[in-house]
Amino acid sequence: MVKHCIDQFCVFGNPINHTQSPYIHSLFSKQTGIVYEYSARLVPFKEFNSYVLNFFLNKGKGANITVPFKENAYVISNNLTIRAKMSRAVNTFKKLHNNKILGDNTDGIGVLHDLKRIKFIKSKFNRVLLIGAGGAARGIIFSLLSYGCSIVVLNRTITRALQLVEDFKNVGSISIFKEKFASNYSFNLIINATTINICQNSNLSTIKSLIHKDVYCYDINYSIKHKYTEFLLWCIKNGAICVSNGIGMLVSQAAHSFYLWYGILPETNSIICKLNRQFYML
């Protein structure tokens, strides 16, 4: 009797007990009919490299990487996709036929996929205010610029925002937010890519006047307890009507990891709806 090896995948992180990835991938497996195993692995902070090496030596086919290891994953990848190079972070590994490890970043394409799904982006000519200039912001800029969005970066530390503009200026239209010209700005979409508590974010008072019923507000963060993050509640309080948390991004970036591994893009809407029902009784 021939024994078939089941493809092995996992997500590396620390902490990892909160991850929804194994559940999401179990739904991808049912949807596509592709049988594979996907587990969550807690990695000690200083042992990421050895854990990854052992996983791929033991027939691992691919993996996802979450905080705080995305930059480590970027460093140890043998090959990188263009979006991983631009992001300087990797959230997806794929083992190639020559046993080399390809590093990719599906965060940006995941955000873009979800924004198109919920119609927060309806054309290629979108004016986006991006709040934050850290790793999360860097991870999504390339895909948005490549699609044709123009981006203005708002960050507490201007030097970090300036660095992002410098790094991505050849990809598309990107600039820093200038407070003295705040009243001159007009945006279709505002994206929060920072985890800073809104009470500690002095930038928000600057953009208060830019929020109204026709501006879409999107937070890449999410909570399994509350549908609306603090940022989204603040947006609603200041006049926003169309808001969304990061559940859709979570599922969509996972779908694009699956696409990298198998060449098939799972349908995401039904899975996002299922998670919303489970988390928020919707």
UniProtKB/Swiss-Prot annotation:
It comes from the Bacteria. Gene3D superfamilies: Leucine Dehydrogenase, chain A, domain 1, NAD(P)-binding Rossmann-like Domain. GO terms for molecular function: NADP binding; shikimate 3-dehydrogenase (NADP+) activity. InterPro entries: Aminoacid_DH-like_N_sf, NAD(P)-bd_dom_sf, Shikimate_DH, Shikimate_DH-bd_N, Shikimate_DH_fam, Shikm_DH/Glu-tRNA_Rdtase. NADP(+) binds at residues 132-136, 155-160, 224, 246. It holds the Pfam family Shikimate_dh_N. GO terms for biological process: amino acid biosynthetic process; aromatic amino acid family biosynthetic process; chorismate biosynthetic process; shikimate metabolic process. It catalyses: shikimate + NADP(+) = 3-dehydroshikimate + NADPH + H(+). Pathway: Metabolic intermediate biosynthesis; chorismate biosynthesis; chorismate from D-erythrose 4-phosphate and phosphoenolpyruvate: step 4/7. Keywords: Amino-acid biosynthesis, Aromatic amino acid biosynthesis, NADP, Oxidoreductase. Coiled coil: none annotated. The active site is at 70 (proton acceptor). Its EC number is 1.1.1.25. GO terms for cellular component: cytosol. Involved in the biosynthesis of the chorismate, which leads to the biosynthesis of aromatic amino acids. Catalyzes the reversible NADPH linked reduction of 3-dehydroshikimate (DHSA) to yield shikimate (SA). Homodimer. Belongs to the shikimate dehydrogenase family. This is Shikimate dehydrogenase (NADP(+)). It comes from Buchnera aphidicola subsp. Baizongia pistaciae (strain Bp).
